[in-house]
Every structure is written in C-alpha cells, then in structure tokens.
Amino acid sequence: MWILALSLFQSFANVFSEEPHSSLYFVNASLQEVVFASTSGTLVPCPAAGIPPVTLRWYLATGEEIYDVPGIRHVHPNGTLQIFPFPPSSFSTLIHDNTYYCTAENPSGKIRSQDVHIKAVLREPYTVRVEDQKTMRGNVAVFKCIIPSSVEAYVTVVSWEKDTVSLVSGSRFLITSTGALYIKDVQNEDGLYNYRCITRHRYTGETRQSNSARLFVSDPANSAPSILDGFDHRKAMAGQRVELPCKALGHPEPDYRWLKDNMPLELSGRFQKTVTGLLIENSRPSDSGSYVCEVSNRYGTAKVIGRLYVKQPLKATISPRKVKSSVGSQVSLSCSVTGNEDQELSWYRNGEILNPGKNVRITGLNHANLIMDHMVKSDGGAYQCFVRKDKLSAQDYVQVVLEDGTPKIISAFSEKVVSPAEPVSLVCNVKGTPLPTVTWTLDDDPILKGSGHRISQMITSEGNVVSYLNISSSQVRDGGVYRCTANNSAGVVLYQARINVRGPASIRPMKNITAIAGRDTYIHCRVIGYPYYSIKWYKNANLLPFNHRQVAFENNGTLKLSDVQKEVDEGEYTCNVLVQPQLSTSQSVHVTVKVPPFIQPFEFPRFSIGQRVFIPCVVVSGDLPITITWQKDGRPIPASLGVTIDNIDFTSSLRISNLSLMHNGNYTCIARNEAAAVEHQSQLIVRVPPKFVVQPRDQDGIYGKAVILNCSAEGYPVPTIVWKFSKGAGVPQFQPIALNGRIQVLSNGSLLIKHVVEEDSGYYLCKVSNDVGADVSKSMYLTVKIPAMITSYPNTTLATQGQRKEMSCTAHGEKPIIVRWEKEDRIINPEMARYLVSTKEVGEEVISTLQILPTVREDSGFFSCHAINSYGEDRGIIQLTVQEPPDPPEIEIKDVKARTITLRWTMGFDGNSPITGYDIECKNKSDSWDSAQRTKDVSPQLNSATIIDIHPSSTYSIRMYAKNRIGKSEPSNEITITADEAAPDGPPQEVHLEPTSSQSIRVTWKAPKKHLQNGIIRGYQIGYREYSTGGNFQFNIISIDTTGDSEVYTLDNLNKFTQYGLVVQACNRAGTGPSSQEIITTTLEDVPSYPPENVQAIATSPESISISWSTLSKEALNGILQGFRVIYWANLIDGELGEIKNVTTTQPSLELDGLEKYTNYSIQVLAFTRAGDGVRSEQIFTRTKEDVPGPPAGVKAAAASASMVFVSWLPPLKLNGIIRKYTVFCSHPYPTVISEFEASPDSFSYRIPNLSRNRQYSVWVVAVTSAGRGNSSEIITVEPLAKAPARILTFSGTVTTPWMKDIVLPCKAVGDPSPAVKWMKDSNGTPSLVTIDGRRSIFSNGSFIIRTVKAEDSGYYSCVANNNWGSDEIILNLQVQVPPDQPRLTVSKTTSSSITLSWLPGDNGGSSIRGYILQYSEDNSEQWGSFPISPSERSYRLENLKCGTWYKFTLTAQNGVGPGRISEIIEAKTLGKEPQFSKEQELFASINTTRVRLNLIGWNDGGCPITSFTLEYRPFGTTVWTTAQRTSLSKSYILYDLQEATWYELQMRVCNSAGCAEKQANFATLNYDGSTIPPLIKSVVQSEEGLTTNEGLKILVTISCILVGVLLLFVLLLVVRRRRREQRLKRLRDAKSLAEMLMSKNTRTSDTLSKQQQTLRMHIDIPRAQLLIEERDTMETIDDRSTVLLTDADFGEAAKQKSLTVTHTVHYQSVSQATGPLVDVSDARPGTNPTTRRNAKAGPTARNRYASQWTLNRPHPTISAHTLTTDWRLPTPRATGSVDKESDSYSVSPSQDTDRARSSMVSTESASSTYEELARAYEHAKMEEQLRHAKFTITECFISDTSSEQLTAGTNEYTDSLTSSTPSESGICRFTASPPKPQDGGRVVNMAVPKAHRPGDLIHLPPYLRMDFLLNRGAPGTSRDLSLGQACLEPQKSRTLKRPTVLEPTPMEASSSTSSTREGQQSWQQGAVATLPQREGAELGQAAKMSSSQESLLDSRGHLKGNNPYAKSYTLV
C-alpha cells in the first residue's frame, strides 16, 4: 500500500523578514536647530538609531538624499553629518542654511527624524552702544545695551562696568535677563562714573565693549511718570521664567498696577512684582495675553502695553503604543497633540508620507486618526505622526507588527483504504486570519451537494475552521484524490490525500488540458478502485519520460511537463493502469499548448515641446489573434490629447503630431491573446527650453539698504539661474558672483543684496539654462545712490566756559545735501544767539562748522550734525564738554559724636573737569568765617572726613569748597550741627526721700550742676534696693524723663515697712552720669498682709472655747505687731447671726468665756499693727459643750374627757444641747402618786389616759439632754371632766418665716364634744375671718396654712375653738421676713487706678445681712462685673481700673431671704485726664534742609499712660498726609527726606484711656544754603478784568464755606437733638443693662408644696422723683428716692375670673394684647422688687404723640393718723409755683471737676417726670399709710422743652403748649389718686415693716398744695384734674379744647363705698380717675407696650383703639 500526499503553499506578496528582537528609537528627539559659526563648522549626529544596527541616511527637506561635497559637506559612516568651515564667499544657501532630516532603517522598518534646520552664521563686524540717561536722586536709572538688529539674535550682554570695574547684581545694581542695568536708589555720586556694557557673540565667541555713558542725576522734582524700560512683546516656552520690564521715572515715586486682558492682575504665587517689573514663574500658555503696566503718581500716569506669547512645546503621542495585528486585519492609530493650536499633522509609514487611498483613511480633527483596512504584509513597519507649526515640530512613532495570516493546515485526514459501503469521514482543521473558506474537490472536480457527500464546518474556541466531508456508504466511484483548499485574503493552502475504495480499478475520463508555453504543467491520472499494480504515461506510444523536462510519478500517477514547448509537448497523452498482471486499463487526454504574446521593448527618446512623436509596439511572438491597446498613466488615452493609434496585425503605433506638456506621462502597450496578456511601459518626458517670466531691468539701489534684482524663468526641467557681475559702467566683463550672507539668490531666481555698498554699482547678468534648447540671458545696470552720510566728526570735544568753540563735520552722498545742527532735541536756528553755522563744499564732500560764542555750562551735552539728502540721512553725535569751576559739594552729616563730627558730601557738578581737591571750613556758630579752622586739599578720592577735638553739645557751622584745574567752587551750603552729648560728669543735687505710704517713697532732687551736665538732661535713673549692712544687693533701676530743674518721683509697689537705699543718676543722650550718694529711708507701717495660721479652737465647757494660732513672720506683719484680735459670733439655729464680738490679746492664744451653751460659733483671728487690722483668717466653727436644758417655756393641760387629759408644752428657751426626750409628770395629792411619762423630743403634747373623774391632777414637764434633766416647768392643775369645755393646746406667740414659703399656723383644740375651730385676722384692730381660697385653707386638725406667704400676710392671727361647754382663743403674730432694703452707696476715695466705695446698710428685712454684691460697669458700657463682700464690711476698694474713666456702681444687700433692692447707681471717675502739650516746651528742636527733629518731651500724659501716638505731615497746599512710622511716644522724633525750602503742616494726636489730644503746627525746611524761607504769603496775579486770581479764589472759597457751614449746622442740629434724647434715656439704659444682669442671676426655687419657681426680681433704681398726688381732701408733694416693685402675674382668663377676690384689677378689655408682662405685686413688701416676664403677650405698636395712661390701684386702710417715718423727708414750705430741689447724692471725687455736668442725670427743675422718677414716687406713695390703698392714675405724654415751665407751674387751665410744641422727651403729665374700693378698706395693717405716719393737718403741706386743697374742698364730686398739666393732648387740626371727659370708675370701684368720721377714719367719696381730654373726631389710642422684660412696667407706651371710655389701669402695690 502506498500513500500520496501533496502540500502546496502560495503567497500573494513579498514581505519583510522579521528579526525576533528588532527595534528603532531616537537618541536625541529634541534636535531641531543647529546654528554654528562659519569659521568653525559643525558635526550633526543622526538622532535616530536601532537594533539590529541601522542604515542611516541624510536628506534635504525636499526628500532629496544628500551627497558629499568635498571640503564642504560629508556624511560619515556612522551617520554623522559634517559641515566644514568655509569663507563667506563659499556660502551656499542649499548647504549652509537649509533644512535636513535623517532616516534609520533596519528589518523593523524605517523611521525619519524631525526636521533639523542647519544654519551657518557669517562673521560680520558690529558695534554696541549705550546712551546717557537722566534720573532723579533716590529714583531708579536704567541703562540699555543697544545691539544691531542683524546680530541681536546671536549677541548677549555678559556684564556691565562702572569705570572699568565690573558690576555684580546686588542691593543697588541689578542686571536683568534682557541685559539692562538697573541702578536703584540713585545718589549724586552715581553720576560721577562712566557705564559701559560688555557683549559676547554666542557662536563666534567675540566680545565687544560699548561706548561710555554717563548718568545725570538731578534733585527730586514733582513730575509725571516717564517710562524708562518696557516691552512690546515677549515670547516664551511654557515652564520658563518670564520677566516683563516696566520701570518709570517720576516724583513722588509712582505706583505700579498690572492688568492682564484689561483685568487687574493678582500679584501672588507665580506672579511677583519686582524692581524691574513683573516676574512670572513657571509660565503657562494661559499666561498669554495683553499686559498693561499702569504707572501713576499724583502728577500723571504712563502705561506700558505689550503682549506675552507663551507657547506650549509641541508634543505628539500615538496610541496605542504597541500594535500587533495580522495580515488582512484593520489597524487604527490616533495621534494626540499638545501645544499650540492650528498645527499641521501628517502621517508617515517607513519614512514615506501616507496619503488617503483605497485601504488608507485619515480622519478626525486635523487628521489625527489613521485607519488602514485589509492590512498586507508590506504594511508592517514604523508609523510616525509629525506635527509642525512654524519652526517647531514634534513626532512620535509606533511599530506595527503583522503576523502571517496565510491559512495553515493544523490537522487533516490521511490516506486510507476503505471497503465498499463503509462510512468515511474526512476532516480538515485550518487556521488563518481572516478566517479562511474551505472547499473540497475529488480528482480536481468540485464536490457538489447531492452527490452522496455531506460537507459541514465549525469554528473552534481557538478560532480555527474545522471542515468535515462525510460519506455515509462509500462506493468504488468515491475513491480518488480528495483535496481541501483553505483560502483567505492572505493566501491559499491546499491539502490532498488519496482515499482508496476496494473494487475493480478503472480510470475516470480526463478533460483536455491547455498549457501555456514556457510554464510548467501537471497531468493527473484519475484512477479509481483498489488495488492496482502500476500507472504509466505514454505519448505517441512512447513511454514517458523520454527527456529532461518530463517527470512521471508512478506512486500517484502524476506527469509533470516543465517549460512547455508547443512543438514538442503538444499532443495526445495516455495513462495506463496495470490492474492485474495480464489486465490493464488506459485513458487518454489531449494537451494543447498556447504561446503568449511577447512585446519588443521600446523607449521614448528625448523630445522637446512642438516636436512630432512616433512610437511602435511590435508583438514579435505569440499565438494569433492578438489584440493591442494603449494606456496613459494607467488609464485609456483620452481623445482630447490628439494621440493617434494605428494597429496592423501584430503591430501598433502611437503618433503625436504636436508635442506639448500635457503629453507628459507613462505610456503602456498591452497585448492579449488566448494564452495571456502582456504589457510594456515607457515614460514620455516633454522638455521645455527656458524663457523669462520676469526680465531684469535697470534699477537704483540705496547705499546700506537691501535691493532685489528681479529675474524669474520657467522651463522643463526647471531651469537654473546664474548671476554674473561686471563692476562699473564700462564695457561689461561679467564674472560669477560669489554668494555670501550679504548676497543671496532667492528661490524664484532673483538676486538679493542685503546691504548695498558703492562697489555693487555695475552690470548684472541673469543667465537661464536647462539643457533644452539655447540658454537665455539678460543684463541690467544697478545704480547705487549714496544717502547722506557723515564721514568725519569728533566724538568728543572740550571747551572752557566763556571761550569760543568750533565744531565741524563732513558729509558725503548724493547732492544736494542739507546739513543742520541740533542741540539735544533742539534745532539750532541762525537767529539763535551765540550760535553760528557755516557750510562749504569741498569736492564730493560738504563741511559744516558750528561756532559757539561764548560757551556756557548749558552748552555741555550732545550736539548732532544732521546730513539729509533725497536718499537718506545720517547723524553724527558730538559730545561737547564745557569745563568750568565745579559746583560746591552738597554736604551732610554722616555721624556726630561727642568729640567728633563726620561729614559726608556728594559732589555735584564737577565742572566737567576732574576734582583736584576739597577745602573744609569749621567754626563755632557764633563766630565769623574769618576765624574758622580750615583743612585744605582733601583728596578728591574721599567723600567723607572727620572733624576732631570738638566740644560736646556745642553747635558748629561747617562748609566746603571743591577745586578742579579750572578753579575753585563757591562755598557749599552751610550746615549747623550740634555735637552729641557726653555723659554727665556730676550727680543730681539735693536728693531727698520721703515715705508716703507703706509701699511708696517720694524722691525729690535737682539737676546736676550746669557745667557738669554735658548736654540736655533727658531723664534720670533711680536705683533702689532693700538696704542691708552687707550692701551686696543689686539696685533696681527705674528710668524717668525729666520735667525741669527740680524733679520728683514716687516709687510704688515697694515692700511694706522695709528699709531702702536709693541713688539717682542723671541721663542725657550720651549716657548716664555718676550716681548720688546712697540715702536710706523706711517705708511706712501697714496692716499685716496675711492672717495668722494654724488657727485652732476647742470647746472646753458649755460656756467657753480655747483658741490658739501661730504668730506671723516679719515679712507678713508689715510693721510692729500690736496684738491679735479674735472676732467671733454665734450661728443661731434659725440661720441668723448673733452679735459679732471681738477680743484683743498680745498672746497667740485666748480663752473665750461667757458663751452660749451648745452653740456653734464662727471664729476669725487677725493681727494688727499701728496701721490697723490685718487680714482675717478663714472662719473656723466650734460648738460649745452640752449642758442640762432649761425648763420648757410653757405648759398647758386640758381635759379631753372624763378620764383623759392632754398636756402640751413649748421647748425650753435654752436648749443647751440636743433634746433627747421630754418627761411628763402627773400627780394627785391624795394619796401622793407621781407618774412619769416619756415623750419623744419632737413631740410637744402628750395624752394621759385612765384618770379619775372630777379629780385634780398636777402636771409638769422636764426636758432631758445627754447632760441630764433640766429644770421642770411650772406646775399646772387639770381636772378630767365629762363635759370638757373647748381648750386650745397650742400656745400664742410669734411665728417668723421667709416670704414665698408655705407656713402652717397650728391650733390644736380638745374638748368634749370636739370643738369647732375658726381663724381670724386682726385688721386695723378689728378681727375678721380669714379668707379661704386657693392660697389659704384650714386643715381638719384646726391648723391654718398659708401657701407662698407674702409680706401682707404678716399680722396677728387668732384661733378660736368652742363647743357647748366653753371656748378658747390664741393669738399668733406672723412675721414674714423679706429681702433687705437698699444700702446708701457713696464714693470715699479715688486714684488713677482705683475707687474706694463706702455705704450705710438699709433695713435688714427682718433677717440679718449675710453679705453684699457690688456691681460696676464702665461708662457707656452695658457689661457689668460683680464682687461679693463680707457683711461686716462698710467699704470696698476696686483696683486695676482704667485711668481717667467714669464708672457706675450699685450695691445689693443679701439676708437669709435673698438679695434685696439694689442701691441707686452712682458714678465716679478715676484720677487722670487726657494728654496735653506743655506751653513751656518748644516742639521743634532743630530744622535743616531735609530733616526736622521734634521735641516730644512737652507731652504730658495727664496722669494716664499714653496708649497711642499718631504723627502726620504734608507740604503746605497738598492734600495727602504722610503718616510717620511711629507707634509710641518718646523723647524726640526725626522726620527725614523732606523737601528743602518747603512749608509743612504737622498734626499730632496723642491718646490715653482718659481721652485724646491733638496739636497742629507749621514749619519750614531751610534753603539749600541753610537760610530760612519767607513766610507763607498768598500771591496776587492781576487778570485782564481787573480781578486778581486770589480775589476770585476768595469768592469761590467764601461761597463754598457758606454752603458747607449751612450743611454742617443742619447736621449739628440733628446730632445735638439726638444726643439730648440719648442723654435723657441714658439713665434708663443703665438700669436696663443692670437689670439684665440681675435677671440672669436672681432665680431661686420657691419652697412651696407644688415646688413652683419663684418669680424673677427686677430692681429699677431712680435717683429722684417729684410727684403731685391728688386726693379729695388732701394733696401732698413727696420728694425722695424710691424703687418700684414689680412682680409677674398671669392675666389669662383665670385671672379675670378672680378679679373680685384678688388685689389686682384690670380695667382694659383687651389687656391680653399687652406687649409686656402685666404685673401683680399686691403681695410684695414695700421696698422689694420681684418680677418676671412670663406670659407676656405682644400687642400693637404705640404711635408717637399719643398719651398713655396707667391706673395703679391699692386698697386704702382706715386708720388713725400717724407721723411720717424717718425715711421720708417732707419739703419745707415754699412759694407758690416753686419746685422742691434736692442736691444730688452722687459722689464726685476731686478729679471730676471737669465732668461736673455728669454728676446729675435727671433734672430736678422740670415738673415732667421720667418713668424712673414715677416709679420712685409711686413707691413712696404706697409706703404712706393714707395712700396705700389709693388708686393712682399715671398719664404719659410727649412734652417739649417749651412746655416744661407751664407744667412746673401747675396751671389750672388747658393750654396749647402740649399740642403745638415739638415732641421731645417722654414724661409724666399727670399723676392722680382715687379713693380705695370699699371692700379694701379693712385690709391688713400689721405688716412686718415700720408703719408710715402722716401729718394730721395742713401745716405740713406746701403753700400751693394747701391753697389747691382749700379751693377744691367745696366740690367733692368734681374730678381732681386741675393739677400739673391735667392732660396730654394729641395735636390735631383744631386747637379748640373741650372740657375733659371724666372716665367712669371701674365696676369694682363703683360697687361699694365707705364713710366714717375724720377723727377715726378717713372719709372717702367715690371719685373718678382723671384722664385725657380729647378733641372731637380725634382718636386717642392707648395700649401697654413693654419694651423688654427687664424694663419697668412704667416704661411703657401704647394707644387705645376707638373711643374706649376706660383708661388702661394696672394694679401695682
């Protein structure tokens, strides 16, 4: 068995062979420009490389590969390009100024470098220069190095020199990045030097030095800014530092402001303002834009405008970075570009540019995307993206690797033998990219469907194609060669194998074959069946092979015919198969051989335009018929070309009768027959002879400028243009032109001459050739026109002042030539004096001469000789220096010492001749210059000198002379200077010490002797120390300023009672003199600083305590110990304090005797000296020992039944210990039996049962302590009764309780039957049943409870018990303790930092004072501080206060109940006042030309330290103040840099804590020569109209002043009006702020059964009130200080329902809308002030000028007359209409004289009361018995100042004063009282306060009140509304007043009335409340408005809506 297998592979393209690790890369991708000097040449390495080694080539930008030019250009084998040095005549633009690139190629591909511009720089001469500059002293100067533009790009400034000395950038000299020289803070000496710049050529290395320039320095003069350095545009790359220069000259120093794109530029971070301008660090493209530098001062502005271009370096990035694909796939590349916009992007593959085509697409913005479809193997390699913009370029590359995608057979079927009917499955597994298509054949015939074969395929996960061929039942005919063919775009692969099916062998019929001559042909024998023996081939019965071209493969039956030949190989071929040895079969096939055409090659010869063309195409062989066609450039030839084609058999000819350029192209002849189609191609090039497009013409060239000689030609090939030159105008002899940097041929063929010279004049020939036809040429003549040029002139020349000077210059050029002379920027005219210009022609030259007669200093400078003709101009600069004697130097004092003066001078104008020396003169100020000391010929190199051996503190005058070779200068300005002081040589005199306190010593002394002071004594140093015999202690030094010849100082904060030694030294500016002799003194004695320590107390008996302590150290005693004081007091059980006692002793122990038994004592110990008591020790507590108790204070016994009695008792008055129990004894006499019963210590009654009826028993009680039984009580007798009468076991007595607590009054009654109990309260001597309500109730055991006890609950309560057999009664006196009364606070002493307050305590409220709270606040501040104070103290000193400041103080006492009323607010001021300048001191110590020394010693601090000091000055007539850099006040201050000979205004402001003071002054600086300037005088200039400018200005100023004055007056009136109102309300604000503080502190919990909170209490203090109180029968004027009491109450519905039973009544229907709390204080004790603001409701806002009215109700008692208490001060009789006055009680220290107006805050002159005054008056009223139950009506209104006099007089008629005047201050227009309600007539009188008494007759009333009372006695029913203003009227249209409407009383008032006799009871009739009169139609509104919860209820405003007949009233008691 044998196997036949054949594998063929076919490829459609040639590919590169890949190395396994090949790559390409760049070694210097940034190389883009190479510039070199022509004299040095350069080497340029190729920036590309690769692995394996690459082939490097260089190309021009046009793509032409460069070649070696011997001696000029060479490419080394390593790829380095070398340009050799060359002379200028060999310069070639093609080589020396061109763009190159190089390529690197290896098997990976080919990459191309970026374009590299190679440029040679020719050496050419150049000069740099610097121009003179001008500036002002103290300003900035800028020198610039001017470089010719032709070399500016290559030449840089490397340094600057100042008189041959190199300058280094430092503090004053700065060299910028652009090469400019900045000189900062220019001084006069800077003008003495020459300045030049040094440059270096970047490529040739040549250096150049500029000419010398001078700096002219002038004195500062007011001027607008002028730009010294700026910029037009700047270009930079991102990341670089950019400097934008902007510097200007101006005075004052201008301000710089930068803008970018017209927006202010924030100078921070990367943007920094420097001396030179703007510095931008790390520039960014966003920084590009327009920049404006605005420079301005008060005299003008200037601008620098320029643009900045910041370019981002171009960067190209290709993605993806790695591309590996397969043949036939698609590859996409993207090129991202960063950098500038609008760049040009192009793609390259293997160094060749890519253009869009069939399979290449370039898309995206700016062609950024490259897409290639159907990649073939040749598409692999290096891809590059190039980006170009201007001269910048960037590239990136990526290698694209294409894998072989040709199909490959992975696995396939093999040859096999099968039996018939056996199934067969053939598999072919193929891979390839793209996926291949698999087809099947059998013996070269395609297998079709339905032939018994099934074909299927699948794609595996690996991407392989698996094709199946299945035969379900094989047959013999299915045998043969099976072939699977895989085909894709990359290629095709075949696999075949034979499948033999057993059966008889045979041959399938074979098709005839056509073979192509010259190629190979295969013939297959298609055998089927198996097995067989052999296969043989025959041709014409001849067994094959019979030659070398025939090969027979017996194993597979294939015959191969190589290089088929028609004559030999064509014919019949037979295949014979031997089936069996004797059996064979055969089959024949005919082979036909076809011969393809063969075209004889042809080529187009060289044709020129217009010629005729004939080209034949001959097919020399090939089978006929043959078809011949022609194509041009791959397309059929169009008929429009005029081409004729003739075809004859096997030939074809192409004919063109008239050749033109359009016939250029590739022509192809194509021959076709049945065998094949062949073609031959040849290129036709039409050559065009040259001809001129632009012919040269004669033209003119101007010397020194560029000229272009035009010449342009065309032709094909492109013609070459060559220029030749013949010098001169003679017969032309043309010679080639040597091209160089000056002469170049442009790309269009024109000749460029950059700088025309005279030698360029002549004939120029333009020759054009291209080897086609004859060359053409044309000549032209260039005429060189010479512009005017200065050929000869002196650069510098000298002249002597006053002499004649001539200067000449020679000009050359085309005539006519005009020569003119200029001085600086001024043209010299013939009519100008002293100048004479003459001109003459000498040959081709013109000579001009300038004569100056005579020369003066102003002639120094630059003269220019300016020559002008029609072709140009030139200028020669001549520096004329006029020499003269120098100007005097400007001298100043460099240093002044006590013995030397160092001068420094600045040389002014040197006379343009070097200074040869200086002369210095010095004299005493008072001497003449004739006696001056002289120093001559000081070296000119010096600019300072020192004068020695002068006297300290003496005044000298100094001047100088300068000399040069011309002469001597005038004397300089005279400087007067005082030598520095030396330290004093003598001590202060008459030093005395005087101790002034325990911690201070007063030191007095006098200045040292005059001749020893060595200057002005500025101050003193006081040295002090604690004196000791050793004397080793170091002195403490205090420095003080001097105030005169006699000095005084007080040393503070010394140790008390200590011996001190003290010395004094005088000081001046030079130092400190010797000290005085040490003097010894001792500080005064003081109280001890510390309390005794280790205080111990031990109770030794029930009545004694032993106390011991440690004595004090000497340091703590502060004096001589006089003894110790022991203070002690008993702490009683009820919390009260016993009497405070003290005992003195000299020993450190003491025994206290006679103490209360078993009592807790507080003990303190202090030491005292002769100065007083020291600090008390901390309290210690010790209790005396127990003893037997005293007898019970009382015993009661009563029968409860026939066999039982009750015993009750009171505790002993002297408990003497803890009661352990009580023993009750009961005995009867017959027989005597004593029974003992024990009761617990907390029970006070005992029931004794089982007694005998009708038998008397004796009962007594004994208390028992741990010490034993005490004394027995009295023995009482009791008898048990069956009918036991009612008896009360409770004892009568006094019950004391704090207010706002629940109190239970016991009443335990016994009897049989059980008695009934009732409680009564005594009211004005008449008992009445107690009221049972929510607050009062009676328990079932008979006890009476009062919840939240109030002051009015005080009084006598009686409990009555009765039954059928008797009754009993007890009386309990209930005393309610209340907060204490206000203390009376005064100021006793003030200092600069402390205020000592003293006070007298008020009533303690029934409970001893526990302490005080002192509040204080700084004036105009609402922040209050507080201090707790001991109850025994009566004064307090506040330390560390501000000096010279007003303070407010209040004091509050506290007892066991709580804090009481605050005292009135008093004010005091610490010592001190605002600073002031002493009139005896001179402000200006010294004045010269530019400096002023101020003497600040004259400032007196006013006793308070200086806190701030401000000093400002400005030149007279200017508006801008200059603030001196000064923050503290010292002895002197110097103002620098002033303008000479100028008047100045000066103002100072000095402040301390007491205030500020200002001082203004004018001064004038001296002239340059030291003289004074005239005083200020207004100049007068007469105008044409006769009116002076000054007069016009006066009129304008006068009108302006009048207008401003009127405006200021109006504003002042508004301010005064506002301040008056603020001052009137200031006191109320003080009370408000204090109330706010107290409201936050005084919250406490009420001890009620329900644990309700107590209300907050607010005290409103009023210093004074004047009140008119009306009654029906009496009227009193009360004047005193009082406080109104306010507490809160709930005015909800519940309160309204209880209005008949409680003491507050609301007479306003909409009271719930009130804006503040409605307050019920009926339970308050007079003089206290609880309040809260809960349940406050908002209401309508009050309107101005509306009256508000409050009615205050309180029941009036009917009691007998009493006298007034001592707290009341009745006014003395006075005249009618007068007003009581009382001196203000505020304490004012002696330092307060200047603020005397502050001591009274409330006017006592006005009858109009403030709300505070009303509150005080009301309190006094309610404390008066006969007014306690009166109803008060308060009417509020707004009054004016004009109406106060009428109100004070108390007019009885209505006036218009209230309605017509301007509203001013809120006040009280009316205050009336109404009778009490009848049911309130019997209210409680037993208050726990002193009773108020009233006078019994009219004697004590003021006369006007008595008169008013008598006048109204007869009208009991008339409303008492005739007093004090009577009403507040709302201003309306009409002024007619109606009789006031009288409001009806409230329903409660009208429901009852009382009457009695005048002797026993006060008679009251029902009256009405006086209210506001109204006009018709007027709406008078009134509603309560509470401004805040802390303000008084009386400080309210409101309005009543509608015609409500009721006034709003509040019940306040």
Swiss-Prot record:
* Compositional bias ranges of the Low complexity kind: 1799-1809
Record organism: Mus musculus
Concerning PTM, the database record says: Phosphorylated at tyrosine residues. Phosphorylation is enhanced by NTN1.
Which stretches of sequence are listed as region Disordered? 1718-1809, 1920-2013
Q: Which UniProt keywords apply?
A: Cell adhesion, Cell membrane, Cell projection, Disulfide bond, Glycoprotein, Immunoglobulin domain, Membrane, Neurogenesis, Phosphoprotein, Repeat, Signal, Synapse, Transmembrane, Transmembrane helix
Q: Which residues cross the membrane?
A: 1595-1615
Cellular compartment(s): Cell membrane; Cell projection, Axon; Synapse; Cell projection, Dendrite
What are the residue boundaries of the Ig-like C2-type domain, all occurrences included?
20-119, 125-216, 225-305, 313-401, 407-500, 504-592, 596-685, 690-783, 787-883, 1285-1377
Record's signal peptide = 1-17
Report the principal subcellular site: membrane
Q: Which residues form the Fibronectin type-III domain?
A: 885-982, 987-1086, 1091-1187, 1191-1285, 1379-1473, 1474-1575
Please give the function described in this protein's UniProt entry.
Answer: Cell adhesion molecule that plays a role in neuronal self-avoidance. Promotes repulsion between specific neuronal processes of either the same cell or the same subtype of cells. Mediates within retinal amacrine and ganglion cell subtypes both isoneuronal self-avoidance for creating an orderly dendritic arborization and heteroneuronal self-avoidance to maintain the mosaic spacing between amacrine and ganglion cell bodies. Receptor for netrin required for axon guidance independently of and in collaboration with the receptor DCC.
Q: What is this protein called?
A: Cell adhesion molecule DSCAM
Q: How does it assemble?
A: Homodimer; mediates homophilic interactions to promote cell adhesion. Interacts with DCC; the interaction is abolished in response to NTN1. Interacts (via extracellular domain) with NTN1. Interacts (via extracellular domain) with UNC5C (via Ig-like C2-type domain). Interacts with PTK2. Interacts with FYN.
Effect of inactivating the gene: The ganglion cell layer and developing inner plexiform layer in the retina are disorganised at postnatal day 4 (P4). This desorganisation persisted into adulthood in amacrine and ganglions cells. Amacrine and ganglion cell populations show fasciculated dendrites that self-crossed and their cell bodies are randomly distributed or pulled into clumps.
Which GO CC terms are listed, alphabetically?
A: axon; dendrite; growth cone; neuronal cell body; plasma membrane; synapse
Does Glycoprotein show up as a keyword for this record?
yes
InterPro entries named among the record's database cross-references? DSCAM/DSCAML_C, FN3_dom, FN3_sf, Ig-like_dom, Ig-like_dom_sf, Ig-like_fold, Ig_I-set, Ig_sub
Q: Name one GO molecular function term.
A: protein tyrosine kinase binding
- Please indicate the ranges of residues that lie on the Cytoplasmic side: 1616-2013
Disulphide bridges in this chain? C46-C102, C145-C197, C246-C293, C335-C385, C428-C484, C525-C575, C617-C669, C711-C766, C809-C865, C1307-C1359
Anything noted about its domains? Ig-like C2-type domains 7 to 9 are sufficient for interaction with NTN1 and commissural axon outgrowth. The transmembrane domain is necessary for interaction with DCC.
Record-linked PROSITE patterns: FN3 (PS50853), IG_LIKE (PS50835)
